[in-house]
Amino acid sequence: VFFGCGASKTASNHFVFTNAKAEKKYINSYNNTLKLWPVAYEERDITTSFGTAHVLISGPKSGEPLVLLHGMDASSTMWYPNIGDYSKKYRVYAIDYLMEPGKSVSKGDKLNTDEIISWYNEVFAKLGLERFYLAGMSRGGWMATHYTLHSQDKVKKLMLLAPVQTFNGIEMDTKTMAAANFKFFPNRNRLKKAVNSLSRRPEKIDPAFKEQMYLGVKNTKSNFDVLQMAPFSKDELASLTLPVLVLVGDHDILNDPNIVEKAGKILPDVNAAVIEDAGHFLTIDQKEEVDKRMLDFLNGKK
Protein backbone atom coordinates (compact mmCIF):
# COMPACT_ATOMS: atom_id res chain seq x y z
CA VAL A 1 0.00 0.00 0.00
CA PHE A 2 1.42 3.37 -1.02
CA PHE A 3 0.21 6.49 0.66
CA GLY A 4 0.60 10.21 0.97
CA CYS A 5 -0.04 12.47 3.88
CA GLY A 6 -0.33 16.17 4.54
CA ALA A 7 -1.21 18.98 2.23
CA SER A 8 -4.54 19.16 0.48
CA LYS A 9 -4.76 22.04 -1.97
CA THR A 10 -7.29 24.63 -0.85
CA ALA A 11 -5.95 27.97 -2.15
CA SER A 12 -6.54 28.87 -5.77
CA ASN A 13 -3.70 29.72 -8.15
CA HIS A 14 -5.60 32.10 -10.43
CA PHE A 15 -2.33 33.48 -11.80
CA VAL A 16 -1.76 30.12 -13.51
CA PHE A 17 -5.14 28.50 -14.16
CA THR A 18 -7.87 29.90 -16.40
CA ASN A 19 -10.62 29.36 -13.81
CA ALA A 20 -11.45 27.40 -10.65
CA LYS A 21 -13.12 24.53 -12.53
CA ALA A 22 -10.09 24.11 -14.79
CA GLU A 23 -7.81 24.14 -11.76
CA LYS A 24 -9.85 21.49 -9.94
CA LYS A 25 -9.77 19.22 -12.98
CA TYR A 26 -6.00 19.62 -13.21
CA ILE A 27 -5.48 18.93 -9.49
CA ASN A 28 -7.52 15.73 -9.84
CA SER A 29 -5.21 14.65 -12.67
CA TYR A 30 -2.16 15.52 -10.54
CA ASN A 31 -3.51 13.29 -7.77
CA ASN A 32 -4.14 10.49 -10.27
CA THR A 33 -0.49 10.65 -11.37
CA LEU A 34 0.57 10.54 -7.72
CA LYS A 35 -1.02 7.10 -7.53
CA LEU A 36 1.92 5.98 -9.70
CA TRP A 37 4.40 7.07 -6.99
CA PRO A 38 5.91 3.70 -5.99
CA VAL A 39 7.01 4.70 -2.49
CA ALA A 40 5.47 6.41 0.52
CA TYR A 41 5.43 10.19 0.29
CA GLU A 42 4.46 13.28 2.22
CA GLU A 43 2.93 16.39 0.65
CA ARG A 44 3.99 19.57 2.41
CA ASP A 45 2.99 23.19 1.84
CA ILE A 46 5.66 25.79 2.63
CA THR A 47 4.53 29.39 3.16
CA THR A 48 6.83 31.99 1.59
CA SER A 49 6.60 35.71 0.87
CA PHE A 50 5.91 34.86 -2.79
CA GLY A 51 3.22 32.25 -2.18
CA THR A 52 2.90 28.64 -1.07
CA ALA A 53 5.42 26.07 -2.26
CA HIS A 54 4.17 22.51 -2.61
CA VAL A 55 6.77 19.82 -1.95
CA LEU A 56 6.63 16.04 -2.39
CA ILE A 57 8.94 14.31 0.09
CA SER A 58 10.09 10.67 0.00
CA GLY A 59 12.94 8.62 1.39
CA PRO A 60 14.51 8.00 4.81
CA LYS A 61 14.52 10.97 7.18
CA SER A 62 18.16 10.21 7.92
CA GLY A 63 19.09 10.33 4.22
CA GLU A 64 21.12 13.15 2.69
CA PRO A 65 18.80 15.70 1.03
CA LEU A 66 18.30 15.59 -2.75
CA VAL A 67 16.21 18.37 -4.32
CA LEU A 68 14.45 17.78 -7.66
CA LEU A 69 13.30 20.60 -9.98
CA HIS A 70 10.88 19.48 -12.70
CA GLY A 71 10.56 20.40 -16.37
CA MET A 72 8.17 23.02 -17.78
CA ASP A 73 4.48 22.27 -17.18
CA ALA A 74 5.40 18.81 -15.85
CA SER A 75 5.14 19.37 -12.06
CA SER A 76 6.93 17.19 -9.52
CA THR A 77 4.83 14.18 -10.48
CA MET A 78 7.09 13.79 -13.55
CA TRP A 79 9.57 11.98 -11.27
CA TYR A 80 7.21 9.01 -10.76
CA PRO A 81 9.41 6.58 -12.78
CA ASN A 82 12.58 7.60 -10.92
CA ILE A 83 11.62 8.35 -7.33
CA GLY A 84 11.80 4.71 -6.26
CA ASP A 85 15.52 4.60 -7.07
CA TYR A 86 16.37 8.05 -5.72
CA SER A 87 14.54 7.63 -2.41
CA LYS A 88 16.12 4.33 -1.35
CA LYS A 89 19.05 6.19 0.19
CA TYR A 90 18.30 9.89 -0.14
CA ARG A 91 15.68 12.15 1.41
CA VAL A 92 14.10 13.55 -1.75
CA TYR A 93 12.33 16.92 -2.00
CA ALA A 94 10.49 17.55 -5.29
CA ILE A 95 9.25 21.15 -5.53
CA ASP A 96 6.40 22.39 -7.74
CA TYR A 97 7.48 25.64 -9.41
CA LEU A 98 5.36 28.58 -8.28
CA MET A 99 4.36 29.95 -11.69
CA GLU A 100 3.43 26.70 -13.46
CA PRO A 101 0.68 24.08 -13.22
CA GLY A 102 1.08 22.16 -9.99
CA LYS A 103 0.03 22.55 -6.37
CA SER A 104 2.18 25.55 -5.50
CA VAL A 105 0.17 28.78 -5.27
CA SER A 106 1.54 32.19 -6.26
CA LYS A 107 0.68 35.47 -4.55
CA GLY A 108 1.42 37.51 -7.64
CA ASP A 109 2.64 37.59 -11.18
CA LYS A 110 5.75 35.83 -12.51
CA LEU A 111 9.02 36.01 -10.60
CA ASN A 112 12.11 37.76 -11.90
CA THR A 113 15.48 36.00 -11.76
CA ASP A 114 16.40 37.43 -8.34
CA GLU A 115 13.01 36.51 -6.88
CA ILE A 116 13.40 32.91 -8.09
CA ILE A 117 16.52 32.59 -5.93
CA SER A 118 14.85 34.29 -2.96
CA TRP A 119 11.84 32.00 -3.23
CA TYR A 120 13.93 28.83 -3.30
CA ASN A 121 16.02 30.10 -0.37
CA GLU A 122 12.86 30.60 1.69
CA VAL A 123 11.67 27.10 0.81
CA PHE A 124 15.01 25.49 1.65
CA ALA A 125 15.26 27.41 4.93
CA LYS A 126 11.81 26.27 6.07
CA LEU A 127 12.65 22.69 5.09
CA GLY A 128 15.83 22.97 7.15
CA LEU A 129 18.08 22.31 4.15
CA GLU A 130 21.49 23.95 4.58
CA ARG A 131 23.49 21.78 2.14
CA PHE A 132 21.94 19.49 -0.44
CA TYR A 133 22.26 17.79 -3.82
CA LEU A 134 20.34 19.55 -6.60
CA ALA A 135 18.95 18.02 -9.80
CA GLY A 136 16.97 19.73 -12.54
CA MET A 137 15.26 18.39 -15.64
CA SER A 138 14.75 20.54 -18.78
CA ARG A 139 13.63 23.99 -17.56
CA GLY A 140 14.43 22.75 -14.06
CA GLY A 141 18.02 22.36 -15.24
CA TRP A 142 18.17 26.07 -16.03
CA MET A 143 16.60 26.84 -12.64
CA ALA A 144 19.10 24.59 -10.86
CA THR A 145 22.04 26.20 -12.66
CA HIS A 146 20.73 29.72 -11.99
CA TYR A 147 20.26 28.93 -8.31
CA THR A 148 23.68 27.30 -7.94
CA LEU A 149 25.48 30.23 -9.56
CA HIS A 150 24.18 32.41 -6.71
CA SER A 151 24.26 29.83 -3.89
CA GLN A 152 27.15 27.50 -4.65
CA ASP A 153 27.90 27.18 -0.94
CA LYS A 154 24.59 25.34 -0.44
CA VAL A 155 24.76 22.86 -3.32
CA LYS A 156 26.96 19.77 -2.88
CA LYS A 157 26.58 18.45 -6.42
CA LEU A 158 24.57 19.64 -9.42
CA MET A 159 22.78 17.32 -11.86
CA LEU A 160 21.48 18.67 -15.17
CA LEU A 161 19.19 16.40 -17.17
CA ALA A 162 18.39 17.68 -20.68
CA PRO A 163 18.82 21.27 -19.42
CA VAL A 164 17.22 23.77 -21.82
CA GLN A 165 18.58 27.29 -22.38
CA THR A 166 21.58 26.47 -20.22
CA PHE A 167 24.54 25.84 -22.55
CA ASN A 168 22.80 26.73 -25.83
CA GLY A 169 19.54 28.39 -26.80
CA ILE A 170 16.60 26.42 -28.19
CA GLU A 171 16.50 26.54 -31.98
CA MET A 172 12.96 26.89 -33.29
CA ASP A 173 12.81 24.63 -36.35
CA THR A 174 10.75 21.81 -37.83
CA LYS A 175 11.91 19.44 -35.06
CA THR A 176 10.43 21.61 -32.33
CA MET A 177 7.24 22.49 -34.24
CA ALA A 178 5.10 19.72 -32.73
CA ALA A 179 5.94 20.76 -29.17
CA ALA A 180 5.37 24.44 -29.99
CA ASN A 181 2.01 23.73 -31.66
CA PHE A 182 0.79 21.90 -28.57
CA LYS A 183 1.94 24.72 -26.29
CA PHE A 184 0.27 27.42 -28.41
CA PHE A 185 -2.86 25.50 -29.51
CA PRO A 186 -3.37 22.53 -27.16
CA ASN A 187 -5.58 19.62 -28.14
CA ARG A 188 -5.21 15.88 -27.68
CA ASN A 189 -3.93 15.21 -31.18
CA ARG A 190 -1.23 17.85 -30.78
CA LEU A 191 -0.35 16.37 -27.38
CA LYS A 192 0.27 13.00 -29.03
CA LYS A 193 2.49 14.59 -31.68
CA ALA A 194 4.37 16.59 -29.06
CA VAL A 195 4.98 13.54 -26.88
CA ASN A 196 6.16 11.56 -29.91
CA SER A 197 8.66 14.31 -30.74
CA LEU A 198 9.94 14.64 -27.17
CA SER A 199 10.18 10.95 -26.32
CA ARG A 200 11.72 7.91 -28.01
CA ARG A 201 9.51 5.66 -25.89
CA PRO A 202 6.12 7.42 -25.66
CA GLU A 203 4.45 4.10 -24.84
CA LYS A 204 6.33 4.13 -21.53
CA ILE A 205 4.55 7.30 -20.40
CA ASP A 206 1.57 6.40 -18.24
CA PRO A 207 -1.80 7.67 -19.56
CA ALA A 208 -2.45 9.37 -16.21
CA PHE A 209 0.63 11.56 -16.64
CA LYS A 210 -0.22 12.27 -20.29
CA GLU A 211 -3.63 13.50 -19.14
CA GLN A 212 -1.98 15.71 -16.53
CA MET A 213 0.39 17.09 -19.18
CA TYR A 214 -2.58 17.87 -21.42
CA LEU A 215 -4.56 19.66 -18.71
CA GLY A 216 -1.41 21.45 -17.52
CA VAL A 217 -1.32 23.27 -20.86
CA LYS A 218 -5.01 23.28 -21.82
CA ASN A 219 -6.33 24.60 -18.49
CA THR A 220 -3.67 27.25 -17.82
CA LYS A 221 -2.72 30.67 -19.07
CA SER A 222 0.05 30.60 -21.66
CA ASN A 223 3.52 30.81 -20.14
CA PHE A 224 6.47 31.28 -22.46
CA ASP A 225 9.05 32.26 -19.84
CA VAL A 226 11.37 29.56 -21.17
CA LEU A 227 12.07 31.76 -24.19
CA GLN A 228 13.13 34.57 -21.84
CA MET A 229 15.66 32.38 -20.02
CA ALA A 230 19.01 33.40 -21.46
CA PRO A 231 21.74 30.75 -21.79
CA PHE A 232 24.55 31.27 -19.30
CA SER A 233 27.85 32.81 -20.35
CA LYS A 234 31.06 30.82 -20.56
CA ASP A 235 32.41 32.71 -17.54
CA GLU A 236 29.29 31.97 -15.49
CA LEU A 237 29.44 28.26 -16.27
CA ALA A 238 33.19 28.13 -15.62
CA SER A 239 32.56 29.55 -12.13
CA LEU A 240 30.69 26.36 -11.17
CA THR A 241 33.53 24.61 -9.35
CA LEU A 242 31.37 21.95 -7.69
CA PRO A 243 30.88 18.50 -9.30
CA VAL A 244 28.33 18.69 -12.14
CA LEU A 245 26.59 15.88 -14.04
CA VAL A 246 25.21 16.66 -17.52
CA LEU A 247 23.06 14.11 -19.38
CA VAL A 248 21.46 14.72 -22.79
CA GLY A 249 19.57 12.33 -25.07
CA ASP A 250 20.93 11.73 -28.56
CA HIS A 251 17.46 12.53 -30.01
CA ASP A 252 16.69 15.57 -27.83
CA ILE A 253 14.91 18.10 -30.07
CA LEU A 254 15.50 20.92 -27.56
CA ASN A 255 19.20 20.27 -26.96
CA ASP A 256 22.02 19.59 -29.38
CA PRO A 257 24.07 16.68 -28.00
CA ASN A 258 27.17 18.83 -28.58
CA ILE A 259 26.43 20.58 -25.29
CA VAL A 260 28.00 17.54 -23.63
CA GLU A 261 31.30 18.37 -25.33
CA LYS A 262 30.80 22.05 -24.51
CA ALA A 263 30.16 21.24 -20.84
CA GLY A 264 33.29 19.11 -20.77
CA LYS A 265 35.40 22.02 -21.99
CA ILE A 266 33.89 24.72 -19.76
CA LEU A 267 32.94 23.14 -16.43
CA PRO A 268 35.91 22.52 -14.11
CA ASP A 269 34.54 19.31 -12.53
CA VAL A 270 32.08 17.63 -14.89
CA ASN A 271 30.75 14.20 -15.73
CA ALA A 272 28.90 14.55 -19.05
CA ALA A 273 27.37 11.94 -21.34
CA VAL A 274 25.04 11.51 -24.29
CA ILE A 275 22.31 8.96 -23.52
CA GLU A 276 21.66 6.77 -26.54
CA ASP A 277 18.15 6.18 -27.88
CA ALA A 278 16.72 8.92 -25.67
CA GLY A 279 14.76 12.04 -26.50
CA HIS A 280 14.15 15.09 -24.32
CA PHE A 281 12.21 12.89 -21.89
CA LEU A 282 15.34 10.90 -21.06
CA THR A 283 14.23 10.15 -17.49
CA ILE A 284 11.49 8.01 -19.03
CA ASP A 285 13.10 6.90 -22.29
CA GLN A 286 16.20 5.47 -20.59
CA LYS A 287 15.10 5.45 -16.97
CA GLU A 288 17.45 2.67 -15.83
CA GLU A 289 20.60 4.23 -17.31
CA VAL A 290 19.75 7.75 -16.18
CA ASP A 291 18.97 6.61 -12.63
CA LYS A 292 22.19 4.57 -12.46
CA ARG A 293 24.29 7.49 -13.68
CA MET A 294 22.57 9.82 -11.21
CA LEU A 295 23.14 7.49 -8.26
CA ASP A 296 26.72 6.65 -9.26
CA PHE A 297 27.43 10.38 -9.46
CA LEU A 298 25.81 11.02 -6.08
CA ASN A 299 27.70 8.12 -4.52
CA GLY A 300 31.02 9.36 -5.86
CA LYS A 301 31.53 6.76 -8.59
CA LYS A 302 32.88 7.79 -11.99
Where are these regions (language model features)?
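Alpha/beta-hydrolase fold catalytic core
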Residues: 3-64, 89, 130, 299-302
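Active-site loop/oxyanion-hole signature of alpha/beta-hydrolase fold enzymes
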Residues: 49, 94-135
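Conserved HGGG/HGGXW glycine-rich cap/lid loop of the alpha/beta-hydrolase fold
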Residues: 54-102
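Flexible "cap/lid" loop of the alpha/beta hydrolase fold
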Residues: 142-150, 157-186
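Conserved alpha/beta-hydrolase catalytic His-Asp/Glu region
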Residues: 169-174, 184-239
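Short beta-strand/loop motif that positions the catalytic acidic residue
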Residues: 240, 246-248
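Acidic catalytic loop of the alpha/beta-hydrolase fold
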Residues: 251-255
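Catalytic histidine-centered segment of alpha/beta-hydrolase-like enzymes
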Residues: 278-287, 291
